[in-house]
Amino acid sequence: MKDLLKFLKAQTKTEEFDAIKIALASPDMIRSWSFGEVKKPETINYRTFKPERDGLFCARIFGPVKDYECLCGKYKRLKHRGVICEKCGVEVTQTKVRRERMGHIELASPTAHIWFLKSLPSRIGLLLDMPLRDIERVLYFESYVVIEGGMTNLERQQILTEEQYLDALEEFGDEFDAKMGAEAIQALLKSMDLEQECEQLREELNETNSETKRKKLTKRIKLLEAFVQSGNKPEWMILTVLPVLPPDLRPLVPLDGGRFATSDLNDLYRRVINRNNRLKRLLDLAAPDIIVRNEKRMLQEAVDALLDNGRRGRAITGSNKRPLKSLADMIKGKQGRFRQNLLGKRVDYSGRSVITVGPYLRLHQCGLPKKMALELFKPFIYGKLELRGLATTIKAAKKMVEREEAVVWDILDEVIREHPVLLNRAPTLHRLGIQAFEPVLIEGKAIQLHPLVCAAYNADFDGDQMAVHVPLTLEAQLEARALMMSTNNILSPANGEPIIVPSQDVVLGLYYMTRDCVNAKGEGMVLTGPKEAERLYRSGLASLHARVKVRITEYEKDANGELVAKTSLKDTTVGRAILWMIVPKGLPYTIVNQALGKKAISKMLNTCYRILGLKPTVIFADQIMYTGFAYAARSGASVGIDDMVIPEKKHEIISEAEAEVAEIQEQFQSGLVTAGERYNKVIDIWAAANDRVSKAMMDNLQTETVINRDGQEEKQVSFNSIYMMADSGARGSAAQIRQLAGMRGLMAKPDGSIIETPITANFREGLNVLQYFISTHGARKGLADTALKTANSGYLTRRLVDVAQDLVVTEDDCGTHEGIMMTPVIEGGDVKEPLRDRVLGRVTAEDVLKPGTADILVPRNTLLHEQWCDLLEENSVDAVKVRSVVSCDTDFGVCAHCYGRDLARGHLINKGEAIGVIAAQSIGEPGTQLTMRTFHIGGAASRAAAESSIQVKNKGSIKLSNVKSVVNSSGKLVITSRNTELKLIDEFGRTKESYKVPYGAVLAKGDGEQVAGGETVANWDPHTMPVITEVSGFVRFTDMIDGQTITRQTDELTGLSSLVVLDSAERTAGGKDLRPALKIVDAQGNDVLIPGTDMPAQYFLPGKAIVQLEDGVQISSGDTLARIPQESGGTKDITGGLPRVADLFEARRPKEPAILAEISGIVSFGKETKGKRRLVITPVDGSDPYEEMIPKWRQLNVFEGERVERGDVISDGPEAPHDILRLRGVHAVTRYIVNEVQDVYRLQGVKINDKHIEVIVRQMLRKATIVNAGSSDFLEGEQVEYSRVKIANRELEANGKVGATYSRDLLGITKASLATESFISAASFQETTRVLTEAAVAGKRDELRGLKENVIVGRLIPAGTGYAYHQDRMRRRAAGEAPAAPQVTAEDASASLAELLNAGLGGSDNE
């Protein structure tokens, strides 16, 4: 029997293939697939349940219903293999051929394929250059189309109605040819000469200038070329033969009660066959034209419904009023073939159960219930039982296991040893959602999980369930052990920090044991070592918190990596000395000699991993957990109501606030403040009161007064349980304690506005009904938000994975010198992220020099690890150019040096690592922690936004970058440049603070001067924008005519008069073309030139500008000539959280984007139109000026005559990433997206490495638009893969030809996913129909480069361990070796089979 199985296995040989091609099927091709024509709509005989002949389930066409048995029963058994029964015509073979044999239907009249007709843009329409409306009218028999005009005045493709057709017939007789229906379209398509048409269009393209026409022509050329190149014929878009799906893929299953469950496809096929047969009969009868026409139309509709039901007109419904599922519905959507069956298969050998805590487990173990283990490891147990001779057959083994005999349990123990299992918790948001453990058999029915891996799984023990999977093959077990074992996943791939970090109880226990306490029992002792400390504690002679001196032996690694001992007496506590016993050798004592909070413990594990490596860290983590649990239990920390201490001052603070509110109410009633001001002030008062209460409360909780040994009072950190939990980072936060013991504070209304009466009570006092009611809204909104957030975050992750899935590390070094400059992230006065955090684990792109010298500090191509980063910090390096995936030169994939360190492993990344997916998971996984809301800025926040000065925090020296300035009459610097930055440098040369300085700011200190901390270095008026003169002289008014271009206004309060320039809309007809300006002249009245140019100093004034000078006044440089009031933009909403991240990755244009200068040059304003200003930028080199129309209401940042650089901001607003890419380049757009995304995550306290965002940006920049084709095959304006252009240009340049020039494109992640070269990947993402239609017409080849395509075709993915397999396959292919599948010829096969059968099936037991 075994030989027989072996033989049958050898028959199915695996196909080796490198690519998959999709194309249109020609009628002959469809016939060649088919095993016979389906002529009847019948399915099976309702009495015998046998398939009807020539019907949809016909056994003659599709194969036998039972294995090796014909329908009438004449031939049975294996020996008649391949015989065709002469009675019923069925071939004797396996039933499974019914899954692969297709049939066909010969259509009596051609029908159009709806995908090529209706999937926009319509391929048939584009090819014929006819509107879709017209084609539809022809296809559905409403009008005629002219196919051949002959000698008449009718043109080809002209549409004729019934009457026009009859008139033409009368006039011309049979001179011309016009038809209707699909045959007409087919004739048109058939008679097209694609190549000639192509030539013609190319000529037209060269002649035309209009942009829209060009676009249309390129579209058509591309389609025609695709047809020519792929060998598809246009007329194949019209079906003359319809393939029929194999019957087992559209099953018909009898239910009990004589009814049938059937696939909808059978109904759809039946309609097609019925209508087709009726049409044949009508044609044979030569029925009247109108009847035949109607039948043809119905046939077209039936075929449409079969292919894609509901795409045209109403969907055909079944008996239960639900639309039938057509072929297109089978493959698209979440329930379609791609996502349901090809990418999401179910797994055999798996189980699931509830999880509970296993605090006694080691990190690499999990507790597995015996019942589950027995079921999961069945095949192994059967095998072992047979091997041992305890069971003769599988059946006997099965019986033994079912009876649960004693020997079975022993064998289970053996089988399980060293056999890892995979544990998975849904939702699997990142790769740490599946990890491998060694099972430990336990009683009960719940899986036990190690507490430290909960953070990675995001699991808790409130009823979560987890699934167990068994890796069956040896390779799978190896991979699980080497790569997926929980002990090998200590660092998070998102940020390279430990993810196996104790939380909650463990943190509390460690914090409690490392706290110190004044005058505790045993204070002042001197102990010989940690052992003695533990003995004293256990015997009750010393408290854990007692301050003692202990002799400690530390070990330090020397230069050779050997451990060197060093013993000293340390001031410490008993608890810390006890904890030292579990710390591995090689770490300094300082790391435990402090009160350990969560952050400190995380840092401790990180240090341990970096110094000592993986194994000691794992053991240490386990020991930390055991110790933490033990001492948390001993601490007895618990929460009682008295722990929530309400500050005495609370009452008084609240009554003060109430008094202030009453006062403002009075002011409002007497009309001194407006309603809006009153509201904002009230809210400010309450917010301040809340802060005071919570400060008083925290001060109260934080410290307690105790008597020390000398009898004096001393303050020490409190041992209040609630405070300890918050302080250690175990649970809770200051904000939560505030609600428990302070006051709840202000609440929001459903519309997002703040209710002005706060909740003054806290939870300890309890809320009254009104307060409770106000709180309900926020609570409910929180829950609703969470539900929305999960869905949105999941969808973002899906899009990210899809765009990045094919990015794999494919080579070691691409050799590029490109890279991005990394500087610390500084916002205002604080360093948000120091340089070391940003460059750690990256590779330098250029030599890093010692500041101020030419000495090389770090050579190029160095992977910066911790020690290098220390060196950079010591030498206070401020900027490092590092390699980045965005600038990597590898064609498909990236190189290891551009990526840098593998964050989860701590060394340079390996080849074959799937960095795209890791990046997508790292960005998507914290998505659920981001907020969903848009922030309304109102009240206190909006007033703070109008800053008017810069006050530095630290002392140091000032450094100004991209600055133009003049000195005013009082000797201060006045800034006249737009994007000036002011940085504060400390004495080591490090940047500490960074500020933007606006135009017109007055600086108190100049470049390079020293400042003290807290000094104000710059100030300006936030409400107006000044016009600063750069020269001294006398003011001369030009075109400033009272009543025409200006008007005089007098301020009521001060009595000063000023001139206001009128807006062009307010001027009289005479003043329309005048340009009011201030000219600076010298004493003789000659023009003064702007220094460094030959332009006269003349300042044009925009509308609404206020001038407070008189004609002829003497002024000096740096003085303000005029002021332009800035309209306050009102309260702007800031999109934050998840929607913001999605907007950035989708590269959406903001509503009113900033306007950037397209070229460098001098600004001037041309003729205005109604509502728009014409901005003209004239380049200095005299080339063509650039013009742009800008709406009047936009506030411009530039004056006439000012010089701007390409990419400078002309009008403020959110910048559009596309503009940044176009004007400032790839690095600028990368920096913009990375910084903006990081801002959102940083606000939530989530750390993500920049690399991951850069990986996604690289994928967004995959496409380029051809600007000039050169000698390449590309079309101008065509969008192509960037790597394709690079490869083509390299080849062209090697042959001495001109390459194509291109501009990079930024695509949103959805667009980029759909625009990938792999049609399989795109089709399984979204818009399946459109993608497949496009691919088929173009005859695309899918090279199966990405991960997704390979999963879909069922191969190992070309990443990780599969990467080597694919490399090897390619190498073997290149060497021309044959695939290793055994080849068997038909004769050999039948001979060996006969031999086997003759030997008898019973005789093989003796083996």
From Swiss-Prot:
Catalysed reactions listed for this entry: RNA(n) + a ribonucleoside 5'-triphosphate = RNA(n+1) + diphosphate
GO MF terms held by the record: DNA binding; DNA-directed RNA polymerase activity; magnesium ion binding; zinc ion binding
Q: Does the keyword Transferase apply?
A: yes
Q: How is the cofactor bound?
A: Binds 1 Mg(2+) ion per subunit.
Q: Which Gene3D superfamilies match?
A: 1.10.132.30, 1.10.150.390, 1.10.1790.20, 1.10.40.90, 2.40.40.20, 2.40.50.100, RNA polymerase II, clamp domain, RNA polymerase Rpb1, domain 3
The Gene Ontology biological process terms listed for this entry are: DNA-templated transcription
Documented EC number(s): 2.7.7.6
Q: Give the record's subunit note.
A: The RNAP catalytic core consists of 2 alpha, 1 beta, 1 beta' and 1 omega subunit. When a sigma factor is associated with the core the holoenzyme is formed, which can initiate transcription.
Q: Please report the name of this protein according to its UniProt entry.
A: DNA-directed RNA polymerase subunit beta'
